[in-house]
Amino acid sequence: MSIIDTRTPEPKRFISGATGDWEVVIGMEVHAQVTSESKLFSGASTAFGAEPNSNVSLVDAAMPGMLPVINLECVRQAVRTGIGLNAQINLKSVFDRKNYFYPDLPQGYQISQFKQPIVGEGKIMISVGPDNKGQFEDVEIGIERLHLEQDAGKSMHDQHPTMSYVDLNRSGVALMEIVSKPDLRSSDEARAYLTKLRTIVRYLGTCDGNMDEGSMRADVNVSVRRPGGEFGTRCEIKNVNSIRFVGQAIEYEARRQIAILEDGGVIDQETRLFDPVKGETRSMRSKEEAHDYRYFPDPDLLPLEFDQAFVDALAAKLPELPDVKKQRLVETLGISVYDASILVTEKAIADYYEAVAEGRDGKAAANWVINDLLGALNKAGKDIEESPISPAQLGAIIDLIKEGTISGKIAKDLFEIVWNEGGDPKKLVEERGMKQVTDTGAIEKAVDDVIAANPDKVEQAKAKPTLAGWFVGQVMKATGGKANPQAVNELVKSKLGIEE
């Protein structure tokens, strides 16, 4: 099958070499474990973290006479994912045997799909950026196919000095292999693609996307060429298990290939591994050593067939996907595309934000969730589900600012108190004397005191009105941040004779 080049060369994506510009071409094969209670062809549990070899049926262990039975839920999840990828759903697909030997593959073959996958071509839109002007670029990435297959078990080589062990708990777990077209042109695009793909499957509930647990991992195909030239020889980097590592692996591999070509060498088509400690790829095996998998239809499984009504019923019940949610947040709550992009990255974050923003100013809610809450969660190493501050509590803090009960500075202090101690924000403001000072007389005295203590600044402010902000800051400091900032600003300008 010939590969079609769908991208026009873009100079901003080029890599500068010693002999001129180069273009990197990237395709990805993402293995996503299907979210289901049981495995693809057996009733064994898929629970992560169980004791070794405790979630293994006779089918998973390939005992003689044991026949596979398709798990309908895995089929549903694959179709739902295909719909979410704007892809063609194939009403007939076939399971094939992929023949190779490995200790953690007890059957001696993997049940996969080769010529007739369950999902055909699709596409997703990624946002790359921001650039130095703060702008994002939307790029369409083609999906070649999605097929269902069995995961293999796990070989463990660190349990004994002279022996290796095999854990078959993962053997037979359903995988969706999602294959992109070679449309990616930079490590940034690859990271954005993998992030978007993970977001989509998490919204759909078809894969948990936990790369640290191995439930989502990527094989990355990398080649380089002169801009707009023929495709180069590609190398495949296997089983990269984090988005950050994907970017690092691509950057290293592209530079490695460029250095070889500029030295007059040739690229060997091979499989490589990424070493995250050294930040480099190393050879695993050459393609010349690769197996002839001898695919043929599995005689124990009939072709998988369903009708369009089955697909339509699943499509009708899909949740709101990230692109649609982002557009809705921008249109209904008036927030920026940038803020909306951050908020929809995780469904739980988007749900939290919408709970905070309900009945409130969308921009203020976005500012607090993105800058304060997510910043605090990141610092504490917590997920949004572990937030010590509930949407109701954060919403109450925003309400207190809008009502003029507390200033923005006091709100930050209140946020810290609620984060560390919990409690009702409104009661805490009362109990701890955090209310904003709105008594004009008290504020005026504070303004007079600051002006009297800084006669030199007064003269400077008359020539340079922007210095009024310095006086406002001093008054806020003197009142412990409790003075109404607007009242302070008006009084300072009035006292200094600065006109609006």
Swiss-Prot record:
Tagged with keyword NAD: no
Gene3D superfamilies: 1.10.10.410, GatB domain, N-terminal subdomain (1.10.150.380)
EC number(s) stated in the UniProt entry for this protein: 6.3.5.-
InterPro entries found in the cross-reference section: Asn/Gln-tRNA_amidoTrfase_suB/E, Asn/Gln-tRNA_Trfase_suB/E_cat, Asn/Gln_amidotransferase, Asn/Gln_tRNA_amidoTrase-B-like, GatB, GatB_C_1, GatB_Yqey_C_2, Gln-tRNA_amidoTrfase_suB_CS
Coiled-coil regions listed: none
Enzyme class: ligase
Record keywords: ATP-binding, Ligase, Nucleotide-binding, Protein biosynthesis
Domain of life from the UniProt record: Bacteria
Keyword Ligase part of the UniProt annotation: yes
Single GO BP term: glutaminyl-tRNAGln biosynthesis via transamidation
Catalytic activity: L-glutamyl-tRNA(Gln) + L-glutamine + ATP + H2O = L-glutaminyl-tRNA(Gln) + L-glutamate + ADP + phosphate + H(+); L-aspartyl-tRNA(Asn) + L-glutamine + ATP + H2O = L-asparaginyl-tRNA(Asn) + L-glutamate + ADP + phosphate + 2 H(+)
Transmembrane segments: none
Gene Ontology MF terms in the entry: asparaginyl-tRNA synthase (glutamine-hydrolyzing) activity; ATP binding; glutaminyl-tRNA synthase (glutamine-hydrolyzing) activity
Pfam families from the UniProt entry: GatB_N, GatB_Yqey
Signal peptide: none
Family in the record: Belongs to the GatB/GatE family. GatB subfamily.
Role: Allows the formation of correctly charged Asn-tRNA(Asn) or Gln-tRNA(Gln) through the transamidation of misacylated Asp-tRNA(Asn) or Glu-tRNA(Gln) in organisms which lack either or both of asparaginyl-tRNA or glutaminyl-tRNA synthetases. The reaction takes place in the presence of glutamine and ATP through an activated phospho-Asp-tRNA(Asn) or phospho-Glu-tRNA(Gln).
Self-association state and partner proteins as the record states: Heterotrimer of A, B and C subunits.
Name this polypeptide is given: Aspartyl/glutamyl-tRNA(Asn/Gln) amidotransferase subunit B
Species of the source: Brucella canis (strain ATCC 23365 / NCTC 10854 / RM-666)
